[in-house]
Structures are given as C-alpha cells and as structure tokens.
UniProtKB/Swiss-Prot annotation:
Keyword field contains Transferase: yes
UniProt EC number: 2.7.4.9
InterPro entries: P-loop_NTPase (IPR027417), Thymidylate_kin-like_dom (IPR039430), Thymidylate_kin_CS (IPR018095), Thymidylate_kinase (IPR018094)
Enzyme class: transferase
Name this protein carries in UniProt: Thymidylate kinase
Record: residues binding ATP: G7, I8, D9, G10, V11, G12, K13, S14
Family designation: Belongs to the thymidylate kinase family.
Chemical reaction(s) catalysed: dTMP + ATP = dTDP + ADP
Organism listed in the record: Helicobacter acinonychis (strain Sheeba)
Record flagged with keyword S-adenosyl-L-methionine: no
GO cellular component: cytosol
GO molecular function terms listed in the Swiss-Prot or TrEMBL record: ATP binding; dTMP kinase activity
Length: 191
C-alpha cells in the first residue's frame, strides 16, 4: 500500500515520518523530490539553479517518474507498505504548472491509496516559521504558503473524487503524539 504525507513546509511532516519509522519498521520510507540518486541531483538543480518555472516543473516530473519506476513500483510488486514524504500532490501544489495529466504520465497512473494531509492556520504557520531558518519557498511569505496549502487540499480531494484515494486531513497544531496515533490508525486500517 502506498501512503503519502502531505502539507506545506512547517506542518510537521518530518516529525511524523520519524514517529512512523518506529511504528512501521518493515515499511519502505521514501520522499519526493529526491527519493533516488538521480532524484537528488534533479532536486538540487530544481531548487538551486536559476530556471524558468516550466523547466523546474519538468525536472520535478522527471524526478517523480524515476521515483515511481525505481522505488514505488518494485515495492508495490512486493506488497510492501510504502510511506512517502510528499508525492505528486506537492508537485501540483507548489508548481505554477499543476497538470494532473502530466503527473499521471509521470506516475504511470500509480497513485497513493492513502493521503495524510497536515494543515495549519495562519497564526500557527507564523509561529512555526519564526522558529526556523527559511528556505526559498518559505521566504515567499505566509500568504503565499497558505495559498499553496489550499492547493494541497484541492488536489488531494480531487484525487479522492476521481480515483478513490482516501484522505485524512489533520490540524498540524494538535500535539505530535495525538497526530501520530491518528495517522497510525489510518494506515493500519488496511495493513
């Protein structure tokens, strides 16, 4: 089963991934972008080189295609539980070019069975961003991140409606232990 954790930077995905590693020790943990050696190179270019938005979008699509082919497909064939930090949903939410058709091509129409969507309100986001050094995306400001967060929700629920992906939406301001318990229960109801 393919499960993804989604949400804007600062909502606690990394914290939850670390907690899930203890709870699901036999799972394959991966990430997008950069879940393969080639993906790491593509991610670095996309994030650090001066590229057009279209070129950047195609680099991320290339990373996604390689990740699906070399990581996700083999693990699904072996009937493994796959837990990914981000997926095509992030790609569509962060990009100005959020083509579902291109993402379906890149993923060979392999979609997550379960989507865990962490969200946060404006005040919570401001508080969390004040506690860390900001990257290029986070430096775009709170309003931009909240707009991107809305795109996450739109894309996650579109996948639910069109393809039957299950969605668990959680307020990231809840305490990490409670979030972990709810996320684990959501994953386990099929495992």
């Amino acid at each position: 089963m393919y499960v993804v954790l989604e949400g804007i930077d600062g909502v606690g995905k990394s914290t939850q991934i670390e907690l899930l590693k203890s709870a699901f020790q036999n799972a394959l943990f991966t990430k997008e972008p950069g879940g393969t050696k080639i993906g790491e190179t593509l991610r670095h270019i996309a994030l650090h080189e001066n590229l057009s938005e279209l070129a950047r979008a195609f680099l991320f699509l290339s990373d996604r295609a390689e990740h699906i082919e070399s990581v996700i497909k083999p693990a699904l064939k072996e009937k493994k539980l796959i837990i990914s930090d981000r997926s095509l949903i992030s790609g569509m939410a962060y990009s100005a070019f959020s083509s579902l058709e291109l993402n379906l091509l890149a993923t060979q129409s392999i979609l997550p069975a379960k989507i865990i969507l962490l969200w946060i309100d404006k005040e919570g986001l401001k508080e969390r961003l004040s506690l860390k050094s900001l990257d290029k995306i986070e430096n775009q400001g709170v309003e931009k991140l909240l707009h991107i967060q809305q795109k996450f929700k739109t894309h996650a629920y579109a996948l639910k409606e069109q393809f039957g992906c299950e969605v668990l939406e959680l307020n990231a301001k809840e305490n990490a232990k409670n979030l972990h318990e709810r996320i684990s229960a959501f994953i386990q109801c099929v495992v």
